């Protein structure tokens, strides 16, 4: 999050709080910890992060709101694959929740502002109960497609899935495959027989 965000970060934090309450009811209040990190290092000081938590009425045990220096934030965002860019009214950034296992390794990434509860609770359940599994190829592919095809719509002030990006990719790959097929077929047809 960044604490000067007026809409998306507070809304996302409230949604996450609802899911954390649900997860803790199912898995136990001490079964996992939550850390929210402010990435706007000049402004997201520990005091600003504490104020943001109070403003969001997030006073759950085991949930820390933290700030960091610029170098630590650069390394953390690189390790987590979190992207953000300066924008005229703050930042454009991924909306991302990262599940980290007991060894400090990224276990699962969840993207989006209003994701379904099981997307976060199921990986937590796997880790808490010791039944971890890796994401299937299709789940991983689906997550990557969601990552690159989710766009911000300023008219509605919401993020949405843009099917045209996905459709354009499929058309492009199909066209490329067809051209490759035709080139190979023509090359084989014109090749001299030995």
Q: Which ranges hold each PLM region?
A:
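Aromatic-flanked redox-active Cys/Sec active sites in thiol-based oxidoreductases
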Residues: 1-6, 39
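Structural microenvironment flanking redox-active thiols in thiol-disulfide oxidoreductases
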Residues: 11-73
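Sec-exported extracytoplasmic/periplasmic mature domains
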Residues: 21-28, 54-58, 78-82, 105, ...
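Extracytoplasmic/lumenal ectodomains and periplasmic regions of secretory and membrane proteins
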Residues: 86-145
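A residue-level detector for well-ordered beta-strand positions
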Residues: 98, 150-151
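Juxtamembrane/start-of-transmembrane alpha-helix segments at the extracytoplasmic/lumenal side
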Residues: 152-173
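Juxtamembrane interface at the cytosolic side of transmembrane helices
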Residues: 175-194
């Amino acid at each position: 999050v960044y604490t000067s965000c007026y809409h998306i970060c507070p809304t996302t934090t409230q949604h996450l709080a609802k899911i954390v309450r649900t997860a803790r009811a199912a898995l136990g209040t001490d079964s996992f910890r939550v850390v929210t990190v402010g990435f706007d290092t000049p402004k997201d000081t520990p005091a600003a992060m504490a104020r943001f938590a109070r403003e969001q009425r997030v006073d759950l045990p085991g949930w820390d709101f933290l700030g960091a220096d610029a170098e630590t934030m650069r390394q953390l965002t690189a390790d987590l694959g979190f992207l953000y860019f300066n924008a005229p009214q703050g930042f454009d950034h991924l909306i991302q929740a990262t599940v980290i296992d007991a060894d400090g390794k990224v276990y699962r990434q969840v993207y989006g502002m209003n994701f379904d509860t099981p997307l976060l609770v199921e990986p937590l359940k796997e880790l808490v109960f010791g039944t971890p599994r890796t994401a299937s190829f299709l789940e991983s592919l689906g997550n990557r497609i969601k990552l690159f095809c989710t766009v911000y719509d300023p008219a509605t002030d919401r993020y949405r899935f843009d099917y045209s990006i996905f459709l354009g990719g499929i058309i492009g790959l199909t066209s490329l495959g067809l051209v490759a097929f035709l080139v190979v077929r023509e090359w084989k047809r014109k090749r001299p027989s030995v």
